[in-house]
């Protein structure tokens, strides 16, 4: 069975049944090599940095948490819970956020959180990173809010070291991948063009403009915004 689906638009020309069948037969005749899975044995961080030191340790009597101050000024709050014994949750935050950037970066900020990890980290593409992390219970995602910069993650106790390595890589070695970004942009533009055919979207846009006094920071992303979005600029903002 061959199926073809797409939006019902006058400017889109779909292949005929005969053309689909012809392409299907051609594809069957092409030589296809068996897929070979390649997984790198390279460590996430080839050379570990010099370890830091704990400058101060104290107890928060209100929450029963341990508060550490590291020699780089970062404060770490450790709180033991018994909600889930095989999971460690981590949230890191610092003042900052999207409001620190001017009007020229508003469109870049609309896709900022989606784009910054597209290229992977360190020596690993996003695809290779997923392969290396297969079988591990670990996740790490940097992001930006209105007035904060954040890194959220979780790990099983056995994979906590991997979580810290990912945090380090996203801080020190974010990776660009132009091909991955182009694929993301093309998908988003196609999705947004179809979305904008829905009259309820136009209604929602008008409502948002009225509520937020036409503030461009509150507007949703549109297909046209990608003309102003710059992948290199986003990665520069991230760093």
Indicate residue ranges for each PLM-predicted region:
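Short secondary-structure boundary/capping elements
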Residues: 60, 226-233
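Ca2+-coordinating acidic residues in Ca2+-binding motifs
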Residues: 72, 128, 233
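Proteolytic maturation boundary segments
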Residues: 1-103
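M16 family metallopeptidases and their MPP-like homologs
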Residues: 1-6, 77-79, 84-173, 185-193, ...
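Short structured motifs
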Residues: 64, 76, 136-137, 233-235
């Amino acid at each position: 069975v061959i199926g073809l689906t797409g939006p019902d638009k006058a400017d889109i020309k779909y292949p005929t049944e005969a053309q689909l069948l012809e392409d299907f037969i051609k594809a069957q005749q092409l030589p296809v090599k068996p897929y070979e899975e390649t997984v790198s044995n390279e460590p996430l961080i080839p050379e570990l940095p010099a370890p830091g030191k704990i400058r101060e340790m104290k107890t928060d009597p209100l929450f029963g948490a341990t508060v550490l101050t590291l020699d780089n000024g970062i404060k770490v709050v450790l709180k033991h819970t018994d909600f889930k014994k095989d999971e460690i949750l981590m949230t890191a935050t610092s003042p900052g956020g999207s409001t620190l950037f001017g009007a020229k970066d508003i469109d870049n900020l609309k896709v900022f959180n989606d784009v910054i990890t597209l290229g992977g980290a360190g020596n690993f593409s996003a695809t290779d990173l997923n392969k290396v992390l297969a079988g591990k219970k670990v996740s790490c995602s940097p992001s930006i809010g209105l007035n904060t910069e954040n890194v959220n993650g979780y790990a099983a106790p056995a994979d906590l070291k991997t979580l810290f390595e990912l945090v380090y890589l996203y801080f020190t070695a974010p990776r660009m991948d132009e091909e991955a970004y182009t694929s993301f942009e093309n998908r988003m533009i196609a999705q947004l063009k179809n979305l904008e055919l829905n009259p309820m979207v136009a209604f929602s846009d008008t409502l948002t403009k009225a509520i937020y006094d036409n503030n461009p920071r509150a507007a949703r992303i549109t297909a046209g915004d990608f003309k102003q979005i710059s992948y290199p600029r986003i990665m520069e903002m991230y760093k």
